[in-house]
C-alpha cells in the first residue's frame, strides 16, 4: 500500500521552495499533499492543492496567550486533517508554521522527517528533533545541532527545483559582462541604492549589463536610474522562470538564502553574497560561509560596505580574473553529482527506510 505523505511548509520562499521540490520528488511514487500558511500560498503552483494551517508568530508577548490558544486549536485541526487523510509520513521544512502539524503528528505517532536547508539548525526543527525519524540537511557540520543526535542526521545534495536541471546552457550574443542583482521581493537599501553608485563607475571602465530583481515599488526608480546613466538593464519584481534569468549571469550579487545560493551554484554562476544581518542565528552568513570555505564565492559584510573597495573589486571580476575563474571551476566540481535522479533516489531511500 502506498504511503501517504503530507509536507508542512509556509512563510518565506526559503521554506516553501524546498517543500515544492520535495513534492515533485515524491508525487509519482507517493500520494503527496502540502500544507501551508497564507503567505506560502503565493509560492505554490495553482495546480497544487494545499491545506491552509495559518499558524501565528510567537514574537509578540502581548498577544502570546492568544497565539498559544490558536496553536492549540490548530493542533486539533491538524490532528483531524492527518487522521482523515490517513497520513503516514509528515515532512516539515521548519519554521513556526510547522508547530501544529508536528505536534499532531507526534500525538498520532506519525513518522516525522525534518528538512533543514540552512547551515544553522532552525529553532522549530531543533524543538522537534527528538520526535523526528530523520533530519535531512546538506552538511554534517550543521550549527546548533545538539549532541547525541548524529544518528538522525542524513545528508543530501541541495534541493534544486526540477526546471533548473532542465535549463539549457545560455548562448551569449554580446560581449557585455552581465551582473544579476537578487534583492528579494522586499528589496533592500544596499541593493537598490548603495550598489548602483558602483555600477555607474564600473560602466565607464567595462561593458556591462545589469539584471536587477527588486520590490515593485522600486522598479520605476531603478529603470530611470539605469537609463539616465546609459547602463543597459532589465528590472523586474518576480519571474516564474528565474532559472532562465539566472543562467544569463556572469556574476550575481545576492542575499544568502539557502535555496538561492544552491540554485546559483548549480547554474555555475559565481556570486557575491551579502548576508542579511538580521537573519535568525546569523544563518545567511553561515550559508554563504559554506560556499566560501570551498572557494566558491565571495562574502561582503553589509555593515562594513565600502563603495571604493567594491568598485575596484568589480573591475577585477569583469576582467574575469584568476580568482573569478577559480570560483567558477569550483562551483562546477561542487555540483558534479547533483542530478535529479540521484537526489530523488536518496530521498526515497530515506523515507522508505524501515
Regions found by a protein language model. Give the residues of each.
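Conserved nucleotide-sugar phosphate-binding/catalytic loop shared by glycosyltransferases and other
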Residues: 7-10, 31-70, 216-218, 303
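C-terminal alpha-helical cap of glycosyltransferases
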Residues: 336-354
Amino acid at each position: 500500500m502506498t504511503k501517504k505523505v503530507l509536507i508542512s511548509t509556509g512563510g518565506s520562499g526559503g521554506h516553501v521552495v524546498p517543500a515544492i521540490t520535495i513534492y515533485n520528488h515524491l508525487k509519482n511514487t507517493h500520494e503527496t499533499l502540502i500544507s501551508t500558511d497564507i503567505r506560502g500560498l503565493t509560492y505554490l503552483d495553482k495546480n497544487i492543492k494545499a491545506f491552509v494551517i495559518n499558524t501565528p508568530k510567537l514574537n509578540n508577548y502581548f498577544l502570546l496567550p492568544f497565539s498559544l490558544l490558536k496553536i492549540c486549536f490548530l493542533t486539533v485541526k491538524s490532528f483531524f486533517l492527518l487522521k482523515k487523510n490517513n497520513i503516514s509520513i509528515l515532512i516539515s521544512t521548519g519554521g513556526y508554521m510547522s508547530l501544529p502539524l508536528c505536534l499532531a503528528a507526534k500525538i498520532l505517532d506519525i513518522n516525522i522527517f525534518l528538512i533543514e536547508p540552512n547551515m544553522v539548525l532552525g529553532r522549530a526543527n531543533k524543538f522537534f528533533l527528538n520526535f523526528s525519524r530523520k533530519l535531512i540537511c546538506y552538511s554534517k557540520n550543521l550549527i546548533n545541532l545538539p549532541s547525541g543526535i548524529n544518528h538522525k542526521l542524513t545528508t543530501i545534495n541541495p534541493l534544486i527545483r526540477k526546471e533548473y536541471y532542465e535549463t539549457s546552457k545560455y548562448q551569449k550574443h554580446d560581449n557585455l559582462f552581465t551582473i544579476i542583482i537578487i534583492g528579494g521581493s522586499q528589496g533592500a537599501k544596499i541593493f537598490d541604492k548603495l550598489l548602483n553608485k558602483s555600477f555607474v563607475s564600473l560602466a565607464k571602465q567595462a561593458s556591462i549589463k545589469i539584471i536587477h530583481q527588486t520590490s515593485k515599488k522600486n522598479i520605476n526608480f531603478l529603470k530611470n536610474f539605469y537609463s539616465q546613466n546609459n547602463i543597459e538593464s532589465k528590472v523586474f519584481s518576480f519571474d516564474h522562470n528565474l532559472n532562465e534569468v539566472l543562467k544569463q549571469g556572469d556574476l550575481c550579487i545576492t542575499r544568502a538564502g539557502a535555496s538561492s545560493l544552491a540554485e546559483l551554484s548549480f547554474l555555475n554562476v559565481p556570486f557575491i553574497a551579502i548576508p542579511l544581518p538580521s537573519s535568525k542565528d546569523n544563518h545567511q552568513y553561515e550559508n554563504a560561509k559554506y560556499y566560501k570555505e570551498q572557494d566558491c564565492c565571495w562574502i561582503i559584510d553589509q555593515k562594513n560596505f565600502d563603495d571604493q573597495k567594491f568598485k575596484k573589486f568589480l573591475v577585477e571580476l569583469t576582467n574575469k580574473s584568476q580568482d573569478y575563474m577559480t570560483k567558477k571551476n569550483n562551483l562546477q566540481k561542487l555540483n558534479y553529482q547533483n542530478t535529479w535522479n540521484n537526489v530523488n533516489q536518496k530521498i526515497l531511500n530515506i523515507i522508505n527506510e524501515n
